[in-house]
């Protein structure tokens, strides 16, 4: 009788364990912040097609990747800063997230820093990655933000072969600065090596020693 009871208990335990296990095709809930992709002068949201596809292949959810289209294509901070602020607020509301991460190309880097420095973005962003960013037009240092518990982490990626934005504008004091070679300004948007550094930056691999 004891053997029969023990066998029954073992069988019941196995059944319950199978029922409790998630389906083999189920994916774990994304732990990433929503990502806002910020284009530069004369750019558009489609500039980030390759980067979006790469991030999706690395586990980011497609519905958490947002690419802004600025009305003002000249990169004017006074116009693009407020639009970016409103856009981030909408993303936070839609996703329920507390913060976003930003990947910005060219003048989009300056627009992002302007938003952080002057328009309340300092407590709404966790990680910033700039690609050939014209960062120095707003700040030459990695702005810490306004969250007392967590500085904004920065990764600034730029190329010695960039003929549009000089490297000295892209470098941010206190950030993780990565100088590459053989990649043009537009090429930063579709380069596999750059993609790897973007992933690291979005996963908290940036720096802020300020």
Swiss-Prot record:
The active site is at residues 106, 162, 185. Keywords: Hydrolase, Lipid degradation, Lipid metabolism, Secreted, Signal. GO terms for biological process: lipid catabolic process. Pfam families: Lipase_2. InterPro entries: AB_hydrolase_fold, Lipase_EstA/Esterase_EstB. GO terms for cellular component: extracellular region. Optimum pH is 11-12. It catalyses: a triacylglycerol + H2O = a diacylglycerol + a fatty acid + H(+). Changing residue 185 to N: Complete loss of enzymatic activity. Induction: Induced in rich but not minimal media with glucose as carbon source (at protein level). Induced by growth on n-hexadecane and tributyrin. GO terms for molecular function: lipase activity; triacylglycerol lipase activity. Belongs to the AB hydrolase superfamily. This is Extracellular esterase EstB. It comes from Bacillus subtilis (strain 168).
């Amino acid at each position: 009788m004891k053997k029969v009871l023990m066998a029954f208990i073992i069988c019941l335990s196995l059944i319950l364990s199978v029922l409790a296990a998630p389906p083999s095709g189920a994916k774990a809930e994304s732990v990433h912040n929503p990502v806002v992709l910020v284009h530069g002068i004369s750019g558009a949201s489609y500039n980030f097609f390759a980067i979006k596809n790469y991030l999706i292949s690395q586990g980011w959810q497609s519905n958490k990747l947002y690419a802004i289209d600025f009305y003002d294509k000249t990169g004017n901070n006074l116009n693009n800063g407020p639009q970016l602020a409103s856009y981030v607020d909408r993303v936070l509301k839609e996703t329920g997230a507390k913060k976003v991460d930003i990947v910005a190309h060219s003048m989009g880097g300056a627009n992002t820093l302007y938003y952080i420095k002057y328009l309340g973005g300092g407590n709404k962003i966790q990680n910033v990655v700039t690609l050939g960013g014209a960062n120095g037009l707003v700040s030459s240092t990695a702005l810490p933000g306004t969250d007392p518990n967590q500085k904004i982490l920065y990764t600034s990626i730029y190329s010695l072969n960039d003929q549009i934005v000089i490297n000295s504008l892209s470098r941010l004091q206190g950030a993780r600065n990565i100088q590459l070679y053989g990649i043009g300004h537009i090429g930063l948007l579709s380069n596999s090596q750059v993609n790897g550094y973007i992933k690291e930056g979005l996963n908290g691999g940036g720096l802020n020693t300020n």
